[in-house]
């Protein structure tokens, strides 16, 4: 993957750490007719944006992701649980669509090119989510105390009553026959491939950083280690 750091430093709360331990990854799609991560990033790089996430996955170029915020920063992603608990990212959609009536309804202006964009964005998102799950020690199908999966969509947050009333990204993935269950399965498969590729023929050594009676304290230490660039996970 080509992950490019292009931080939105004009955001008024840039650099502010989330107040809760990171326990999940929240997936969005942008909800506008745009396949360029750069265009999405530029729209968010303002003092008081309508929303801002940690990264944007491109739908125009294979493997391209723009990082907008440091991993440990809070986000303005879903007006709810995701802002303080989740690593959040958007997936660009397509230039070949037109939204109607100010909601999630849209029409496709060029079906072939639209499907190419959505499929490319999906593939990029699978690889990126797999990389972040490995980095944060997140299992996509693990369940959180609120009933959500540890890898969940904005729409799933809405259905669980912990996110704002958006239906992304399933409203565009339905056109390519994909669901969040498919996505989690694909991410788990990509995680396995990435682990095998990174560790093929290598012996690995694990270092324990601490032992805690309180899981929240353990999560805080793990998050500090991740922010410093280490791969960290909590295990009982």
Predicted segments, located by residue:
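Solvent-exposed beta-strand motifs enriched in subsets of small alpha/beta binding domains
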Residues: 196-236
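Hydrophobic faces of well-ordered beta-strands that scaffold small-molecule active sites
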Residues: 27, 87-89, 151-153
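Short coil-to-beta-strand
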Residues: 80-102
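Residue-level signal for secondary-structure boundary sites
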Residues: 35, 63, 76, 97, ...
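Glycine-rich, acidic and aromatic/proline-enriched surface loops and short helix-turn segments
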Residues: 60-62, 90-94, 157
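N-terminal catalytic cores of peptidoglycan-degrading enzymes
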Residues: 1-85
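Basic/polar, cationic surfaces and motifs that engage anionic cell-wall
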Residues: 3-7, 14-19, 95-199
């Amino acid at each position: 993957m080509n992950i490019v750091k292009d931080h939105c430093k004009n955001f008024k709360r840039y650099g502010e750490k989330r107040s809760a331990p990171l326990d999940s990854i929240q997936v969005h799609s942008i909800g506008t007719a745009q396949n360029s991560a750069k265009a999405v990033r530029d729209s968010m790089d303002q003092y008081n944006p309508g929303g801002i996430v940690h990264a944007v996955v491109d739908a125009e170029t294979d493997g391209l992701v723009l990082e907008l915020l440091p991993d440990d920063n809070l986000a303005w992603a879903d007006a709810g649980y995701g802002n303080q608990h989740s690593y959040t990212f958007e997936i660009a959609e397509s230039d070949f669509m037109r939204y109607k009536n100010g909601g999630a309804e849209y029409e496709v202006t060029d079906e072939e090119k639209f499907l190419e964009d959505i499929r490319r964005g999906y593939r990029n998102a699978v690889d990126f989510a797999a990389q972040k799950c490995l980095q944060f020690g997140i299992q996509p199908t693990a369940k959180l105390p609120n009933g959500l999966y540890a890898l969940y969509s904005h729409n799933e947050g809405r259905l669980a009553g912990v996110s704002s009333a958006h239906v992304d990204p399933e409203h565009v993935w339905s056109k390519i026959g994909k669901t969040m269950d498919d996505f989690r399965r694909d991410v788990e498969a990509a995680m396995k491939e990435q682990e095998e590729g990174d560790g093929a023929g290598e012996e690995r050594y694990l270092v324990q950083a601490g032992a805690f009676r309180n899981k929240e304290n353990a999560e805080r230490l793990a998050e500090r280690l991740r922010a410093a660039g280490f791969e960290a996970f909590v295990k009982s």
